[in-house]
Amino acid sequence: MPEINIAPYPKLFEPLDLGFTSLKNRVLMGSMHTGLEDIPDSHERMAAFYAERAAGGVGLIVTGGFMPSETCLPEGAKPLFKQPEQVKNHQIITDAVHEAGGKICLQILHTGRYSRQQNLIAPSPIKAPINRFVPTEASGEQIEQEIKNFADFSIFCQQAGYDGVEIMGSEGYLINEFVAARTNQRSDQWGGSYENRIRFPIEIVKRVRERVGEKFIIIFRLSMLDLVQGGSSYEEIVK
């Protein structure tokens, strides 16, 4: 590996102690879809892809998004990652990364009003510009179920050997739709004030932590600025 000048970032390649575990350095490979998720031998291919990144020096890898609920599965998509055989398949990925000296988190992604199927839900029935389907406004019971889905899904990730999960709360997907006033026009406990709009992601994180325990990484990904009218402001994000 060629020598890299890290003078501006002297701690970049130092270990990071998380209390219950440590990362070999502070290099994180952010979540991205690789195109390998839905092809034959996908788990073996993802294992090889991510293991090579770990061997190359990445301390913590975050996978592309996996969906925790039927309400966000596109038409024709594979079944949810909740069956024992799927847990076993994902262990192929985590084992390969661990053998290469890295750690890996799985991103949990609910696409909300971006989901390309007719039974999609959102905080408010506002159609996404990129989708022909109009979402149904989620009921209180549906909101509670989606929170539970995130928590349940995190257990399957833990069983598959992942070191943690990343909860996708940015870029216009379901969690971000609750946080932003532009897409959340509710007047109940899940909408209106910022404290109400942020309730959904906070409850998700709390429930996930309750299910997985303290010795499991939880990353929460949020948009720093939505850069659209009615999106989250800098002041809200700082809160």
Question: Residue locations for each model-derived region?
Answer:
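Flavin-dependent oxidoreductase catalytic cores
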Residues: M1-K239
